[in-house]
Amino acid sequence: MIVVSNTGPLIGLAKLNQFELLRRLASAVYIPPQVHRELLAKSGPEAAAIDNALHEFIQIKIPGAVDSATTDILKGLDEGEKQAILLARSFSSPVLLLLDDRAGRTAARKLNQPLTGLPGLLLKAKDVGLIKDVLPMIEDVRAKGYWLSDAVVDAVKVAAAKR
């Protein structure tokens, strides 16, 4: 599967030191230029993991052109989210968009763009046997400052219990 990511899920993976999950789940990982800039500006303990992933397997790609209807749907989003959604839509083959921000997810759904967030990616990793349990990772990433709502965590608990 080809993945296009916004900044947030990549920062979450860096906080967990789990970029290898993304590398193993995706055939290719792309980010737009604005997401690249946001990742390069990240400091702290996860900066080295981000830098390694950028050099090893994450590719930068410029999004395609946008029509006025799409522009209206993307209005109000930050530039990284806009570019990530546009980049995901520019591929001719199916692409999974990694995006955790609620407003961005709402816009992507309006455009019928398949998407998941960090929790969904961790659930997929569990499904294919790359990790045993999702909940400790969710708790760990939240403890390290990655914001996930209680509702999202509750949904992950339900989904993980069914797997």
Task: Please provide the spans of the model-predicted regions.
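Helix-rich interaction surfaces within compact, conserved domain-sized segments
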Residues: 138-140
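Short, flexible loop segments at boundaries between secondary-structure elements
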Residues: 125-131
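Active-site-adjacent loops and short helices of periplasmic peptidoglycan-processing enzymes
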Residues: 105
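Active-site-proximal, substrate-binding regions of enzyme catalytic domains
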Residues: 1-96, 102, 111-113, 136, ...
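Conserved, well-ordered active-site substructure
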Residues: 116
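Glycine-rich phosphate-binding active-site loops on the catalytic face of alpha/beta enzymes
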Residues: 120-121
